[in-house]
Amino acid sequence: MDLFHALEKKLGKLNIIVEDLGFLTPSVLKLVKDSGFPGMKVVQFAFDSREGSDYLPHNYPTHCVVYTGTHDNDTILGWMNTAPKASVKFAKEYLNLTKEEGYNWGMMRGAWASVGDLAIVPMQDIIGVGSEGRMNTPSDLRRQLGVERQPQTRLTTNFAKRLLNTCKCTDV
């Protein structure tokens, strides 16, 4: 904590997000709490039975940053196609995901409507690409950065209006 106190004394308030994902020991949890920095909540993790219920949006604290997925996850649509059927079914029921709305739009709505102070959605999820748009696969040395390979034709005026309206409807 001394490092963070010294940095704040020199630089002022720090805008740091704690990557509190994976295996967390009691000492790590204490450090996160003592730091006062927001942690991460990943919506995709909510429906993976191995992750427990802390990732379900109704369990989020307000002082957190919500992500639909991270650079190490598949895109929403990729996840919908590869996750266990029970996980996908749970996600559809919990977030009221429909094909008509678009599964990516429904999961984004869930992130943006959560109580978290901030929600971040990767561009791959916004433009609605599948696994071909995945940014990174841990331990895979091939270059991925999938969004750069996506057609610009997805970014229409109607698309921009829909994104703006969705953001406005979930801004509290």
Give the predicted meaning of each segment.
Residues 1-172:
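Catalytic cores of glycan-processing enzymes that make or break glycosidic bonds
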